[in-house]
């Protein structure tokens, strides 16, 4: 049986700062970009990543999953933490200590199970303070990886000064203007600021409720934006 460290070294490839992310792009950039293009093909691509070189500009941290020697899943993050995030001054300040934001998640065709491995670990590890904005199918995928919905008031503080429009009555979904189009999103993650119990998990009924809302709002967005 393989040791855990051996398994991790064989399957996980990480970049923990701009310099190491840049090295990952030098080595795996074509695969990373192809996977991101595939993952975001239904929504016109990933915002801000139009070529592989853009990955370095968007990501402060990257995690790749390698299966049988090939990169099959990509997760990119922006570091939104304050340099002194652990101090009492900033620990509970959502406007300064904003955790680690997911900026892109994708898997190559038929390999979503490996992206799920990355996200399940991230949403389980509370100290990572991982969160992201999701809509439509991506919202359901994140929920099934253990992400917890974040109330609008907390999401708005974290996203400040970006403006929220049409805050939905459910208390979680909101609409933002992105490149001239209205997009309804839900923020989800595991951040302690969100006042979730560490052991809290959504029921299947909860997941289905949020899934139905995500699909409903995505359909409304398509009509509104004439897609």
Regions found by a protein language model. Give the residues of each.
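Conserved acetyl-CoA-binding loop-helix of GNAT-fold acetyltransferases
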Residues: 107-124
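Terminal substrate-recognition subdomain of acyl/acetyltransferases
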Residues: 4-18, 78, 82, 129-227
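A conserved beta-strand-loop-helix scaffold within acyl/acetyltransferase catalytic domains
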Residues: 43-67, 71-100
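Short, high-confidence coil segments that cap the C-terminus of an alpha-helix
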Residues: 59-60, 125-128
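Helix-loop element at the rim of GNAT/NAT acetyltransferase active sites that forms part
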Residues: 31-50, 217
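Short amphipathic alpha-helical segments and helix-helix/interface helices
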Residues: 52-53, 116, 120, 139
